[in-house]
């Protein structure tokens, strides 16, 4: 699929031009509102800097969390504006609203090389509305912030699988381009789906089988092996007839897991041992047991050392690796060993020439939390859900729209 890229925009000249950029600045905050992981802010900088250095008047739209009933002071983008300004090396204005009088006045007052961050885009319910008309009306107001002759740059890969006003609808109204982050993500994922060097190993973790079912079924016919860890492995173990104690279990998915094991028994790889404890907390003493001998009064919170050793050996021979989801509750030091072991095995394989992709979300957070160099992997995605849906073969609305003719053009590129 051919999409319009950011490299096409400077050719037309951005100096003095208003550019609306949809970034993914959805960073985690602690109880005091302090950013605990600025990875997504860092990832947004190259596109913004390129536009600002070119003299564009940049208006940034982004969200934080999931506001339920309109504006929520705890989800204001104020700390994000400060952090973004530090990384850009210039002042970032924060509008007090999204498309209201403050945002309009600030947008009109921008000079070349200025940047304005709108308040949390999801404070307006129309952003995520299922009603096409509501979303389009909101998108038109967003487009007005960079009119006349405005442009739209999509650089929030973590939201391109959402059909939302600032992701999809605004791209139907303005000349649209993929930012550097989005273009790079697409290039990497295309490599995982169309030009994969084998052996191809996939590592899947996280809590629920239901969240990963689509990608398991899609990749089981493409990958040479799929390692299953994290909370989801216990539903697979239960499908084999094993008792899993009080471990996380999706009973409604047991039959599905049994079918997957029957169909893809030569591809799926399950843990041979797990680390268990009596309650979900950081302090109870951990115990390593065989995967088929989990005590009834315990829950599994990590894969065991035997599993790490077996999976690491498999990964050492891989030429392509995709990893999405931690192997255990890495936030608790006693149950981070499995995730660390798998991460280090992928790093080692990468050092030997393997192409490795960390599929965003909790996996990327785990890499940073465990102090593992991000540069040790070939690519760390900023979009967990978007990456999975792309690999499933789904159409991502925010990507599909970037391949459409620019407003006023036909499919052939000429005027309408």
From Swiss-Prot:
Substrate binds at residues 24-26, 40, 63-66, 122, 162. Its main location: cytoplasm. GO terms for cellular component: cytosol. Keywords: ATP-binding, Cytoplasm, Glycolysis, Kinase, Nucleotide-binding, Transferase. Coiled coil: none annotated. GO terms for biological process: gluconeogenesis; glycolytic process. InterPro entries: Phosphoglycerate_kinase, Phosphoglycerate_kinase_CS, Phosphoglycerate_kinase_N, Phosphoglycerate_kinase_sf. It catalyses: (2R)-3-phosphoglycerate + ATP = (2R)-3-phospho-glyceroyl phosphate + ADP. The keyword DNA damage does not apply. GO terms for molecular function: ADP binding; ATP binding; phosphoglycerate kinase activity. Belongs to the phosphoglycerate kinase family. This is Phosphoglycerate kinase. The gene is pgk.
């Amino acid at each position: 699929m051919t999409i319009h890229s950011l490299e096409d925009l400077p050719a037309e000249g951005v100096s003095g031009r208003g550019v609306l950029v949809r970034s993914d600045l959805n960073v985690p905050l602690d109880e005091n509102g302090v950013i605990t992981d600025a990875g997504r802010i860092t990832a947004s900088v190259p596109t913004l800097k390129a536009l600002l250095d070119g003299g564009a008047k940049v208006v940034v739209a982004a969200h934080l969390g999931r506001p339920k009933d309109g504006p929520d002071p705890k989800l204001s983008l104020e700390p994000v504006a400060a952090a973004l300004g530090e990384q850009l090396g210039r002042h970032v204005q924060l509008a007090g609203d999204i498309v209201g009088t403050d945002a309009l006045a600030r947008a009109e007052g921008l000079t070349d090389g200025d940047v304005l961050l709108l308040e949390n885009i999801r404070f307006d319910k129309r952003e995520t509305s299922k009603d096409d008309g509501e979303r389009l009306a909101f998108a038109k107001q967003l487009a007005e912030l960079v009119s006349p002759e405005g442009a739209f740059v999509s650089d929030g890969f973590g939201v391109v699988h959402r059909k939302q006003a600032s992701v999809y609808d605004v791209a139907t109204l303005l000349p649209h381009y993929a930012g550097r982050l989005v273009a790079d993500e697409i290039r990497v994922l295309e490599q995982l789906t169309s030009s994969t060097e084998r052996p191809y190993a996939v590592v899947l973790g996280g809590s629920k089988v239901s969240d990963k079912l689509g990608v398991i079924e899609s990749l089981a016919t493409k990958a040479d092996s799929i390692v299953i860890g994290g909370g989801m492995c216990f539903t697979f173990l239960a499908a084999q007839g094993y008792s899993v104690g009080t471990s996380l279990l999706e009973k409604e998915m047991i039959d599905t897991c049994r079918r997957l094991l029957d169909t893809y028994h030569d591809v799926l790889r399950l843990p041979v041992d797990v680390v268990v404890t009596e309650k979900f907390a950081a302090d109870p003493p951990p115990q390593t047991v065989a995967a088929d001998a989990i005590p009834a009064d315990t829950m599994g919170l990590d894969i065991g050392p035997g599993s790490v050793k077996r999976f690491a050996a498999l990964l050492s021979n891989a030429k392509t690796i995709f990893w999405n989801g931690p192997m255990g509750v890495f936030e608790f030091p006693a149950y981070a060993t499995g995730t660390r072991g798998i991460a280090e095995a992928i790093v080692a394989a990468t050092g030997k020439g393997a192409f490795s992709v960390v599929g965003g979300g909790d996996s990327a957070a785990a890499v940073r939390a465990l102090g593992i160099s991000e540069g040790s992997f070939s690519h760390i995605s900023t979009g967990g859900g978007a990456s999975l849906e792309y690999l499933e073969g789904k159409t991502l609305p925010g990507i599909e729209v970037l391949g459409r003719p620019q407003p006023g053009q036909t499919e052939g590129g000429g005027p309408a």
